[in-house]
């Protein structure tokens, strides 16, 4: 199986579905309360961000998922930086509704996406990327067993702003 193949991943806590325009209303509701989160990839316009991620998917560079909990889309996560000639991938552009943060949803989603990458797609390393200032996300990444690999300054974000990333890897 390839990292770019559409797939549904599911466990008792969360379901990861291929992102589609059908998720727009739920995701627009889910982003409420995240206006403060300047350091993460919460989109200003959910429909525009879905369109952007689907264009990246169609170009073979990204495989975006809607994170679904209790029947509603509550966030997004993505395989990105896909290079089918390299046995590694990045997981990023993740954001979750405040109502599911610090619940089992994020950990369950990350375990699904990591398991799929390592087991079904046979990658040897996964990079999880977050903003340096996003301490909550960095702590969650560490709980998954990933270790921080350094700090990258002046990286362009999807919002076309420069940011400082704290990449971590699990292999």
Predicted regions and their residues:
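GNAT-family acyltransferases
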Residues: 1-105, 116, 120, 126, ...
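Short Gly/Pro-enriched loop/turn and capping motifs at secondary-structure junctions
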Residues: 133-134, 147, 155
